Amino acid sequence: MGRTLDYEFSYGEEITITPRNYEFDFRHAGKINTHYALIGMAFVSEGYPLYYDAVNEKGLGMAGLNFVGNAAYEDVLPEGETDRDQVAQFEFIPWILTQCASVKEAREKLSKLRLTGTAFSKQLPTSQLHWMIADKDACIVVESMKDGLHVYD
C-alpha cells in the first residue's frame, strides 16, 4: 500500500515515526504503553501524531481517505454504558496499528469498536473519512455511517 498524499497545499504533514512503547493516551480507550512501532505521514499537534496513513513494524498498513458527506460517527457513551472500545476517529489509525499485526487481528478489534466523532480540538474538527487496512494477505475498507460501522473486503 502506498500513496503520495498529493494536495494543492500542505497542512504541515511530515514523515512521522512512533517508536515501540511510546505512550498513547487515547481519549476514551485508555492508555497503551506496549505496542508496535509505526511510520507514516502525520500532522503532529501538541505532541500527538495525527496520522493520514501509516504502517507498523509487522507490515500492517492503514490509510484514512476522504468520505465527505457519507461519514457519521457515534456519540461517546458514559463509561459503563457500552462493552465496546470507544475510539475517536482521529485516533483510529494508531489504535489499530499499535495493537494489530494483521487484517485478521484488525477485524477482531473492529467487532468491538464504537468509532466516535470526538474532535482533536476546536481548531482541528472531526474529519469525514473512511479507511483502508491492508497486509500482505488481505485488504479491507472500514466505513462509519449513520447505520453503523461497515467492513468490506
State what each model feature region is.
Residues R107, T118-Q128:
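Surface-exposed patches in mature extracellular/periplasmic domains of secreted proteins
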Residues T82-T116:
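Alpha/propeptide regions of enzymes that mature by internal proteolysis
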Residues L124-D153:
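Extended amphipathic alpha-helical segments with heptad-repeat/coiled-coil character used for oligomerization
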Residues T4-D6, F67, S111, K136, ...:
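An acidic- and aromatic-residue-enriched active-site/binding cleft used to recognize and process polar
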Residues V55-E57, A88, T126:
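Short, solvent-exposed loop/turn segments at the edges of secondary structure
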